[in-house]
């Protein structure tokens, strides 16, 4: 289990204020909230890119005191993606900048279904395929915690569903925390939801307990949940 109890400021501006939650293996945690609510900052604090006040515990041990290398072996981070700029093969791209061990790149690419395309240029990949390669690069580190910052933000519906299906499967043996902008994907794939607004936790709990009224208080828009054969959809209420 991962326990987070942190605050963080950019200068005098409080970006995270007493954020307190836990995440477990086998349960995908989605972090949602309005723009500027601190979602990306939260992931960067857990990943060790930013240094917050407080504690981040993994199995009861504070990982904020670890060296960057030791932290990277426990926590893997996939930032918001942009299109690739340089002509590397898929395998070369995964090997770049990661603390991987012998065989870990192959295992990671196989886990996301991209091993057979390891010799292809990343410049020729679709947006969804490139996102899978980014996830593989994080998996190659072998961390127990996987952080994903808006993994579907630039994808069409079909690619987004494919990526989120993979993300959910990865969480069976890992602690997975994903910032999501799509409320429908949140309801469909997340086991637990953490809602941030102005750097504070406004709601945290199992997805099945999330209500339209909670979302209205956060986003200032009336919603309703429409249940169908493919799951529950979130739609604005007129």
Predicted ranges, named:
Residues 32-34:
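The feature captures the beta-strand-to-loop junction immediately N-terminal to the Walker
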Residues 47:
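Helix-to-loop junction immediately C-terminal to a conserved catalytic motif
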Residues 54-62, 71:
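Conserved ABC transporter NBD signature motif
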Residues 103-118, 123:
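Conserved ABC ATPase "signature" region
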Residues 146-150:
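Catalytic Walker B motif of ABC-type/P-loop ATPase nucleotide-binding domains
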Residues 212, 218-238:
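ABC ATPase nucleotide-binding domains
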